[in-house]
Amino acid sequence: KIGSDSVMVRISPSRMMGGLYELPDKMAILEKLLKEFDLCGLRQLDLSCANSNYFETSGKVIRKIKKFWPHILIGGASLTIEEAENEINLGYLDMVTWGRAILANPNFVELVEKGLPLKEFDNSMRESLI
């Protein structure tokens, strides 16, 4: 049996969809939703605002929800390595998730370990996955 301690929930209160779309009454909804997640025993949350600037979207939300979400918080897909380290060191994120960066850089770990620059993701890179 898979328990709530083995489940991570991913939510997207902001998205790039022909421009930035943000959930109406975002903070009120998130506060209620996260309290319910907590009551269910969920302890891992991935806050994704895919294809948008972290500091303009999920970074702002993360700073607010830390007050009522004391559990594992994951996010930051658009962050650089240095920005990600800073968000973790400041206690805003527990883990950083990179998807597009890994697709663009199959040798992601090696590049990060050596401090080498990462290629920018381009939507055409998705074609090689099919």
What are these regions (language model features)?
Residues 1-130:
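Flavin-dependent oxidoreductase catalytic cores
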